[in-house]
C-alpha cells in the first residue's frame, strides 16, 4: 500500500500543473497530458516519487537527523509551519535570509537577540521600561519571530534534509543546502527545474490543499522515523 493514494492526490488537485506556456521542458517526463492550456501531472509518478521521498525522510529521521521545512509563498506558509511543529522540526515560512545556513554564526546572533527580548518580556523587564522603548522592542521581537522563530533551536550540523515547496521560489535556500551537501526533497511543479532537487515530488505547488497533503506526509515520515529511532535505543 502506497503512502499516498491517487484518490487523495486527485481530491487535493495535485495533478494541476501550470499553463503550458509557463513550463520547464525538463518536467516533460512527469507530465501526463495537456488540458485547456494547463499541463496535467502524471499522478502515478507522483505516487511513486512521494513514496521514495517518504522513505528517505523516514530514514533521515531514524538516524536522529533534523529536517528543515522551507516554504515562503502564501499558499505554503501555514502548512510548512503547522507540519514542522507537529513533527517537532524546524521551518522557514516568511523569508529566506541570505546565509541562513551558510553563514549560520551571524544568524545565531539574531536568534540570541530574539531569545533575549523574549526573556525581557517574560521576566517583567517590559513593565519597568519606558513605553516608547517597549513598543520598539515589541516591533523588533515581532520581526525576529517572523523570520527566525522556526529555527530558534536549529543545529545547523544536524540537518539531514531540506523539504521545499516550490524550488523556483526557494532557489537561494536550495543553493545553500547544496553548498553544505544537504539533500533536498521538494514539491516540483511543471514550471520548475527537477535537476535542482534530489527527491522530486511532481505536483501542484500553488493549491493550499495539495501543499498541505504532501507536507503532512513528510511530517508523518519524520514521526514514523523517530519511533524507529526510539525503538532502536
Curated annotation (Swiss-Prot):
One of its GO terms (molecular function) is structural constituent of ribosome. One of its GO terms (cellular component) is cytosolic small ribosomal subunit. The keyword Transferase does not apply. Keywords: Ribonucleoprotein, Ribosomal protein. The keyword Ribonucleoprotein applies. CDD domains: RPS2. Transmembrane segments: none annotated. One of its GO terms (biological process) is translation. InterPro entries: Ribosomal_uS2 (IPR001865), Ribosomal_uS2_bac/mit/plastid (IPR005706), Ribosomal_uS2_CS (IPR018130), Ribosomal_uS2_flav_dom_sf (IPR023591). It holds the Pfam family Ribosomal_S2. It comes from the Bacteria. HAMAP family: Ribosomal_uS2_B (MF_00291_B). Belongs to the universal ribosomal protein uS2 family. This is Small ribosomal subunit protein uS2. The lineage of its organism: Bacteria, Bacillati, Bacillota, Clostridia, Eubacteriales. The gene is rpsB.
Amino acid at each position: 500500500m502506497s503512502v499516498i493514494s491517487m484518490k487523495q492526490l486527485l481530491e487535493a488537485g495535485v495533478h494541476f500543473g501550470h499553463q503550458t506556456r509557463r513550463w520547464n521542458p525538463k518536467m516533460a517526463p512527469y507530465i501526463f497530458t495537456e488540458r485547456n492550456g494547463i499541463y496535467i501531472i502524471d499522478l502515478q509518478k507522483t505516487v511513486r516519487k512521494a513514496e521514495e521521498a517518504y522513505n528517505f525522510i523516514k530514514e533521515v529521521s531514524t538516524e536522529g537527523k533534523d529536517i528543515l521545512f522551507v516554504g515562503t509563498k502564501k499558499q505554503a506558509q501555514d502548512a510548512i509551519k503547522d507540519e514542522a511543529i507537529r513533527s517537532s522540526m524546524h521551518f522557514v515560512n516568511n523569508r529566506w535570509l541570505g546565509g541562513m545556513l551558510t553563514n549560520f554564526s551571524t544568524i545565531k546572533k539574531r536568534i540570541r537577540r530574539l531569545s533575549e527580548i523574549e526573556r525581557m518580556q517574560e521576566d517583567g523587564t517590559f513593565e519597568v521600561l519606558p513605553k516608547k522603548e517597549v513598543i520598539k522592542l515589541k516591533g523588533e521581537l515581532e520581526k525576529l519571530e517572523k523570520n527566525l522563530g522556526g529555527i530558534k533551536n536549529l543545529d545547523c550540523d544536524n540537518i539531514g534534509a531540506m523539504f521545499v515547496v516550490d524550488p523556483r521560489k526557494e532557489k537561494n535556500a536550495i543553493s545553500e543546502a547544496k553548498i553544505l551537501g544537504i539533500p533536498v526533497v521538494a514539491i516540483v511543479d511543471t514550471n520548475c527545474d527537477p535537476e535542482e532537487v534530489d527527491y522530486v515530488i511532481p505536483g501542484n505547488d500553488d493549491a493550499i490543499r495539495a501543499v498541505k497533503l504532501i507536507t503532512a506526509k513528510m511530517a508523518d515520515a519524520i514521526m514514523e522515523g523517530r519511533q524507529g529511532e526510539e525503538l532502536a535505543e
